[in-house]
Amino acid sequence: SDVFMDYAGGKAVIEIVLNQVFETEKTCAGKYLYLDFLSPHEIYDKVVVIDAGHGGPDAGAVGRLYKEKDINLDVALRFGRMISEHYPDVQVIYTRKTDVLIPLAERGDIANRAKADLFISIHINSNKSSSPSGVSVYVMGVDKASKNMDVAMKENDVITYEEDYSTRYQGYKPGSTESLIMFSLMQYAYQTQSCLLADMVQKQFVGNTQMQ
């Protein structure tokens, strides 16, 4: 943790940088300001981290009018506001709220530091046709494993935009044989849980929209 102080134009600024995610409660008493840093779970029943995929120089899929990174961010912010409005006992934390590139490792770290109950990463599909309507769900499993693998490898290519990504990700290289083997071993993890959650989300999504 670090504390930075600055005074300019008659205003004092104190910046506190913490290595964990906290909620802050402020109390004033005379000339003193007291700050209490509390874990989100001390205030909320559940903590949800919403991750808007891509960002910054990584545009994701690019269409004639829109970039995936911008749609992801818009959906993430709308989704977060909806959760806050309907479920006040749930704390919403975003990996990004502006057009910036957040390293993949940092996205996971944010969720881990907050001890999140659920991590939701939002991405948008691309399609050559303008008429498709519906939902696609990708789950790492044994069926159509190679197609799932291609999606995972492509999404993780974003790390090439990061400085010193080879060291940060312990030698991981997008597209390499070693990385392919690693993903093959990892794709079975949480398969059942992923399928159940995806099924519930898809049914709710289709049931509350005009999509087929």
Regions found by a protein language model. Name each.
Residues 1, 209-212:
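Short, intrinsically disordered, charge-balanced linker/junction segments flanking boundaries
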